[in-house]
UniProtKB/Swiss-Prot annotation:
Its EC number is 2.5.1.39. It is an enzyme of class 2 (transferase). The keyword Transmembrane helix applies. It is a multi-pass membrane protein. The keyword Transit peptide does not apply. GO terms for biological process: ubiquinone biosynthetic process. Signal peptide: none annotated. This is 4-hydroxybenzoate octaprenyltransferase. It comes from Burkholderia thailandensis (strain ATCC 700388 / DSM 13276 / CCUG 48851 / CIP 106301 / E264). Belongs to the UbiA prenyltransferase family.
Length: 287
């Protein structure tokens, strides 16, 4: 069992934290905004751990769902499940176990948060299968990656206001942007095996679609800043995030595989800039 532990860590992408960070930033944004910059430490711990656990569970179930496809994709052919180093039932067991631990974390929270968690688990578990049917599965991914947003508002305010759904919409646009760049890396392989991705759907308009999604996401955050009366620290963070999106254009415009992958990874800085602006606004407002 101990000898297989490194394989399990690879299955849940513990060696690749970028996915966890892309989930974490929008969740932290929601926690800070919902609590006016003063989230309870216990809530921060619960949502950070829950995000990490559910992302790991999602990786395991994704590899289970895609195991017959991944062996035909250069980037994924050596994943533990695809290469036969672990079995399908092990991946399912790990995913279920991580989801159960994540649910245990929210037991102290209110009923609305628990109800939303059921929806969150359903969306996360079904996302890998959406790639067979949806032309832009990355939009579904945005809902799965962003469901911590309404849950955060529910945990703090015991309601989910329109603001939370706007933040979730922003996350959908952001997810389509960064995951389309990611899908551009695998586009040739995905075309051969019949996988549906936004990079394939957008075709020669892929770069334009990515930049429009960035613009939509940043536009929603302008609305958030105006309606919440955020100060200059927020707008500095917003400007840094906008600068990141422009930098990503320079990486993806020639559609070179490794540059597209670099753009995907760099979205961590875009998300971090927005959260830094939100946190700094509340911190300075409290002085």
């Amino acid at each position: 069992m101990l000898a297989r532990f490194p394989l399990y860590l690879r299955l849940i992408r513990m060696d690749k934290p970028i996915g966890s960070l892309l989930l974490l930033w929008p969740t932290l944004n929601a926690l800070w905004i919902a609590s006016d910059g003063h989230p309870a430490p216990s809530l921060v711990v619960i949502f950070v751990l829950g995000t990490l656990l559910m992302r790991s569970a999602g990786c395991a179930i994704n590899d289970y769902a895609d195991r017959d496809f991944d062996r035909h994709v250069k980037r994924t052919a050596e994943r533990p499940l695809t290469s036969g180093k672990i079995r399908a039932w092990e991946a399912v067991a790990i995913a279920v176990g991580l989801a159960l631990v994540s649910f245990l974390l929210i037991l102290p929270l209110n009923a609305l948060t628990k109800e939303l968690s059921v929806v969150a688990v359903f969306v996360a578990a079904t996302y890998p299968f959406m790639k067979r049917f949806f032309a832009i599965p990355q939009a579904y991914l945005g809902i799965a990656f962003g469901f911590g947003i309404p849950m955060a508002f529910a945990a703090v305010q015991d309601t989910v206001p329109a603001l939370a759904w706007m933040l979730l919409a922003a996350n959908v646009f952001w997810s389509v942007a960064y995951d389309t760049a990611y899908a551009m890396v695998d586009r040739d392989d995905d075309l051969k095996i019949g996988m549906r991705t936004s990079a394939i759907t957008f075709g020669r308009y892929d770069v334009l679609a990515i930049m429009l999604c960035y613009a939509a996401m940043l536009g929603i955050y302008v609305w958030v800043g105006v309606t919440q009366h955020f100060g200059w620290p927020y707008w500095a963070g917003w400007a840094a995030a906008a600068g990141c999106s422009i930098y990503h254009y320079t990486l993806i415009k020639d559609r070179e595989r490794m540059a597209c992958f670099a753009a995907f990874r760099h979205n961590n800085w875009l998300g971090g800039a927005l959260f830094a602006g939100i946190a700094a606004h509340y911190a300075l407002s409290a002085l």
